[in-house]
Amino acid sequence: MNKTQQQLLINAIHTIPDYPVEGIMFRDVTSLLEDAEAFKLVMELLENKYKGRGFTKIVGTEARGFLFGAPLALALNIGFIPVRKPGKLPRPTYSQAYQLEYGEDILEIHQDALTPEDNVLIIDDLLATGGTIEATTKLIRRLGAQVQEAGFVISLPDLGGEERLAELNITPYSLIQYQGE
């Protein structure tokens, strides 16, 4: 990504202070989605990064991971698997509790969504503490699938998510990093 492209993405992502709780600087990717040029650029950059890498499925985390994971799956001609909050998936599920930077939650995946033959790429909008991706990784591995990489639009390196993913042997990649926030 060149500097012009990077600046386009930075300009398209709005920062909302003290949301959802005081002390959080929320990076709003929904503003990026409103900018067709920026959204298209994100999808092209992710496609170029991951095409031809042998992934068989993309797992996207609720909810903003769906916004980038599903179109990327289409571009790569592979399936998309949603990981959702409790009670949102109709077939039998596995659940995993996790901590996030401003609370606690649970994620679920369909029990039949993946097989040991699957090589999975996780996609989400933002990497902060890594709790969401740790829970997602545990769900994927519980189904026997392989997962070693996760892609993000934004990462906040100072919150420790990259280190947390390294402990899980997950290599993170992000388009934009916000240091010191």
From Swiss-Prot:
* PANTHER family, per database record: ADENINE PHOSPHORIBOSYLTRANSFERASE (PTHR32315:SF3)
Keywords attached to this Swiss-Prot or TrEMBL record, sorted alphabetically, are: Cytoplasm, Glycosyltransferase, Purine salvage, Transferase
CDD domains associated with the record: PRTases_typeI
What's the source species for this entry? Colwellia psychrerythraea (strain 34H / ATCC BAA-681)
Q: Biological process GO annotation list? A: adenine salvage; AMP salvage; purine ribonucleoside salvage
Per the record, the pathway is: Purine metabolism; AMP biosynthesis via salvage pathway; AMP from adenine: step 1/1
Q: Which PROSITE patterns match?
A: PUR_PYR_PR_TRANSFER
Reaction(s) catalysed by this chain's protein: AMP + diphosphate = 5-phospho-alpha-D-ribose 1-diphosphate + adenine
Domain of life assignment: Bacteria
Q: Which InterPro entries match?
A: Ade_phspho_trans, PRibTrfase_dom, PRTase-like, UPRTase/APRTase
Protein name per Swiss-Prot or TrEMBL: Adenine phosphoribosyltransferase
